[in-house]
């Protein structure tokens, strides 16, 4: 059961990293469109908006590390839930 939990956590970590990387690339493409639109049609605080749309610092390595962090937290939650008292003892009923 432990091996299955670890395998599922690692699988979902890589799946999350792939989806996050695709989403960030899509957002970066959209951000370049918005930045070019802001240059042609200036708005108040346009530079602030353009700077907030920068996804250049987020690399696939960062998304992979974030996904691994999610997997570790999910495993920690699963292990802490599985080591708690059985349901019958926690509610005060006797377990046969």
From Swiss-Prot:
Any one Gene Ontology cellular component term annotated for this protein: membrane
Span of the signal peptide: 1-30
Entry superkingdom: Eukaryota
Keywords recorded for this protein, A-Z: Membrane, Signal, Transmembrane, Transmembrane helix
Positions of transmembrane segments: 55-75
Extracellular side: 31-54
Cytoplasmic side: 76-96
Entry keyword annotation includes Cytoplasm: no
Topology within the bilayer: Single-pass type I membrane protein
Subcellular location field: Membrane
Name used for this protein in its record: Uncharacterized transmembrane protein DDB_G0286141
């Amino acid at each position: 059961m432990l091996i299955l939990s670890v395998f599922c956590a690692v699988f979902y970590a890589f799946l999350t990293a792939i989806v996050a990387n695709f989403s960030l690339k899509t957002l970066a493409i959209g951000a370049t469109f918005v930045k070019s639109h802001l240059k042609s049609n200036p708005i108040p605080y346009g530079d602030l908006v353009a700077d907030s749309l920068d996804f250049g610092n987020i690399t696939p390595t960062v998304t992979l590390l974030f996904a691994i962090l999610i997997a570790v937290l999910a495993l920690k939650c699963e292990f802490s839930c599985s080591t708690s008292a059985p349901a019958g003892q926690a509610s005060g009923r006797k377990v046969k």
